[in-house]
UniProtKB/Swiss-Prot annotation:
Family label: Belongs to the acetolactate synthase small subunit family.
Subunit-level organization: Dimer of large and small chains.
Chief place where the protein resides: plastid
UniProt superkingdom: Eukaryota
Any Gene Ontology biological process: L-valine biosynthetic process
EC number: 2.2.1.6
Reactions performed catalytically: 2 pyruvate + H(+) = (2S)-2-acetolactate + CO2
Gene3D superfamilies: 3.30.70.260, ACT-like. Chain A, domain 2 (3.30.70.1150)
The protein's name: Acetolactate synthase small subunit
PANTHER family xref list: ACETOLACTATE SYNTHASE SMALL SUBUNIT, ACETOLACTATE SYNTHASE SMALL SUBUNIT 1, CHLOROPLASTIC
Entry keyword set: Amino-acid biosynthesis, Branched-chain amino acid biosynthesis, Chloroplast, Plastid, Transferase
Signal peptide annotation: none
ACT domain residues: 4-78
Amino acid sequence: MKHTLSVLVQDEAGVLSRISGLFARRGFNIASLAVGPAEQIGVSRITMVVQGDNRTIEQLTKQLYKLVNILNVQDVTNIPSVERELMLIKIQINSQTRTEALEIVRIFRAKIVDIAEDLLIIEVTGDPGKIVAIEQLLTKFGIIEIARTGKILLVRTSKINTEYLKNRVVAYGT
């Protein structure tokens, strides 16, 4: 099972290297990684997605706490949260496919960030499912390049049932 870990670290040289070294020694692949400043000065938030069962992730969390500069580690896999990714995707187009490609961009509320006679660069922001869905739809045009961030997230503080909301959005098409 894929687990999402949110790790707060002191923003100092070598912290990410020590974390990735720990994962490498344990034979773990990091499927997704995003690092950036947190709300406190001198603190960074690392969001990573790793594969493993619950027991293995617990052990990994304990090992992370043993590293210098680790302030907090939280497995947020089953905690309601707001998740986002960003993807830039360059596709081939021509006069016959341009309208269809632009319609897909509109439906997904993506943005055209560059356009030429024979290509589009599209910016898509959303949950991982949205990113995968638009990528699959754009495959038929001929994907030239993709750049995709890792997942970022913040834990929700409200008690709103997000699965219920997702189902309502799909049901009403908004």
